[in-house]
Structure formats: C-alpha cells, structure tokens
C-alpha cells in the first residue's frame, strides 16, 4: 500500500533526488555513461481499483512512471525500455515523445519472464542493465549510481541487488547475507521458512546486471515455486553457481516502497 514516507509535501526534487549524477553516472570519481534501463510495468495493478494504468497514477501531479523515467534520463541511460502488458495502449500513449522503447508481455508469468521480453530491445547492447519497477518511483539517482559503480568493481559480482530494511517487511522476499556485502541466499516470502522470514533485509526487486550474462541466466530460471512463476531474483543463485559473487546495496526504505493504492 502507499506509505506515509515522512517527506512532507512531495515536490519534484525532493521526491527524486539525483545526487551528483548529471549526464552519465558520476559516483566516487568514476563515470559510467553506457548503461540501459528496463522498467517493468506489465502488472495489472488490480488493487488500485481504477481504469487508469497503475504506473500512470499521479504523484505530485505527474504520473509515477514519468518520475522514474526522469531519474534515469538524468543519469544518462543509453536505452530505456518499458515492459508493458494489459493497458499497453494507455502506456504507449503516455510514453510518446519520451524516447522510450516498449516490450510486450502477453502473459503474466513473473518478473523473470517480464525481463526476457526486453531481449530484442537490448539486442546489440553491451553494458550494465538496471532493472526497475514502474510502481516504485522513489528510488534516487544516487542509489542507482551506487548500484552501477558496485557492478563495475574489480571483483565483478555480476549482480547487484537493491535491498532495504523497512519497519514492516510484510511479504517481501528476504536477502540472506554471507561475508561482507555478498549474498548467501535470496528467497521469496512464500517460499521462506520461519528463520528466513525473521531476516530484516528485504529484496526490492531492483537490480543491476551485466547484459552479457542477463539473458543466459534468465534462460536457466525455472518456475518450481509456490506461485509457479519465473522469479527474476533466481538469477542471483544461478550467478553464484557459475562462480560469481552477487552483492547487495542497501537503500533507504522509502526508496523501495511500492505504490499499491490511490491513498
């Protein structure tokens, strides 16, 4: 559900702080200018109880999806792809003129399947990919820059997951840490045992992944889980099995808050 984020009035700059980003990501003395973004927006958003597509509901007078697109545009993303499903006509009309490509997910088979729909749009691209959610518009440019910087580090983690520790973890998937920022395990709430559900660190779903590996790993994701869906976070364990060391970046809880009602 929509949360009181403690930000007071949600004006533009305060809603989406850009940090020191500018054109191309500047973070810690490093420039990362060649990256793409995939935004998942194919969910039906039935809890919004509205004919307007979920990600087009306004925040501070502007559709939430456009807030997120402004953030990644300010960072200098070379390609911006929005995965659409039901209500695609509304979305495509709203995105016209914003330099965004769309990919269509005809069936709702999970987040891993949704990202696979962006494969053709990313054809020929070599570089990091940020995977974001159209109904989670509060993530800051500074946090996204940190994710890209960590992905490019010398230890080549392969996957960087954005997590947070909200006061009420509700039914979020959990991130189990190993040494340092290394991820030992990720588990969806539906599939977690009691000890795993007690972990405070929650998966936001947002991540940064090298494009060279992304679709190979997605092809190995199965759907033998409680929901029968292809989970995007499963690529973390696949990366580990292939010798990579996926890591976590922790953001503020408000950055990972999804909007699920019109309140």
Positions of predicted regions on the chain:
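Rossmann-like NAD(P)H-binding beta-loop-alpha module
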Residues: 143, 164-195
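A short, conserved acidic/glycine-rich loop-to-beta-strand motif
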Residues: 154-165
